From Swiss-Prot:
PROSITE patterns: RHODANESE_3
Family: Belongs to the TrhO family.
Species of origin: Streptococcus gordonii (strain Challis / ATCC 35105 / BCRC 15272 / CH1 / DL1 / V288)
GO-annotated molecular function: oxidoreductase activity, acting on paired donors, with incorporation or reduction of molecular oxygen
Catalytic residues identified in the record: 184
Listed name of the protein: tRNA uridine(34) hydroxylase
InterPro entries: Rhodanese-like_dom, Rhodanese-like_dom_sf, Rhodanese_C, TrhO, TRHO_N
Gene3D superfamilies: 3.30.70.100, Rhodanese-like domain (3.40.250.10)
Taxonomy of the source species: Bacteria, Bacillati, Bacillota, Bacilli, Lactobacillales
Coiled coil regions in record: none
Amino acid sequence: MAKDIRVLLYYKYVPIENAEKFAADHLAFCKSIGLKGRILVADEGINGTVSGDYETTQKYMDYVHSLPGMEDLWFKIDEENEQAFKKMFVRYKKEIVHLGLEDNDFDNDINPLETTGAYLSPKEFKEALLDEDTVVLDTRNDYEYDLGHFRGAIRPDIRNFRELPQWVRDNKEKFMDKRVVVYCTGGVRCEKFSGWMVREGYKDVGQLHGGIATYGKDPEVQGELWDGKMYVFDERISVDINHVDPVVIGKDWFDGTPCERYVNCGNPECNRRILTSEENEDKYLRGCSHECRVHPRNRYVAENGLSQAEVVERLAVIGESLETLVAQ
């Protein structure tokens, strides 16, 4: 059965004059053709994911390719049955990828047009995965890795991308004398991060060109050596990558059983992304810890209209009480 919706994932590092006005004009065009999605515009370039029917997405690609400096912009296309977004957002930001270098005394930000790692095709990246002398580093957030990753890839002990440079410096002895290849969803983060590694003095740095999204569509590798699913930042939440021997590697936060369903912790001050079944979400009030379960603003409790007596009853089932809440 034909799928009616196309999802476009793309980015391009290219200087954009008057980027704030560009963002406003871009939003107006997207709305005029009925496109949905999320786009970041900065002085350094553009990064977005959008969805629509065939005609709408074709109009959008033609429009982008008509813009100065974007004639060769690479769209990665998924075909889906439903829209991946409900609304259309185009926002101006200082950077399309925030590595946090200037915030953390790491000198100036990286310009990928000047410094970046060597591009690896899916076939070359697969060879790197099988090479014992090559270190493969996942540059995504922890919850993205936990849902799916390349076999043997290192999981940095970080919560978000901005923490990665410091983590690499703290673990420098593991990488400095080895070949290092990095990967991310579509390539935009790796362009900047691999450039930073080159600037740090790493001699042999590579990156998966086009990211995981391209690897999964390559007719030769067919996503092999990828385990689990790829996390995406839209209504789909995840997509398949391995078309050879797929496996589930995600584990339920509460009981460790196989799981690929993500929710945000019910505590708005925590908001951690956790994998869990609907049954365990109900059982644990969508809280990743006791403190989050008994938090006064627990969203699960509010959304389901649970009384305090009902909360106490749920907590008792898992051997907990409201004592922490009372003490706050």
